[in-house]
Amino acid sequence: MESLSLIQGKFTESEAVDIISSMVEVKIKFHENKITNTSNEEDIKMQEARIKELQNDLAALKKSIAAKGRKIEVKAVVTVG
């Protein structure tokens, strides 16, 4: 298995929110592009559901980060197997 460490470190609240939000926005745009390039209703619904899930998860994570009020440890690893 191959892996890529994208993020590893301690960040301020605003830095953590910025970096995580940026990554989630890239993933949302990926799903939006998939919607644009398909006419299959089932695929569109799956992409829309995933976008909503990402938005909800990001909102919850932002609340959690705000509640901590200190440096936040963030790790993001992509593993390909």
Where are these regions (language model features)?
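Extended, charge-rich alpha-helical interface modules
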Residues: M1-G81
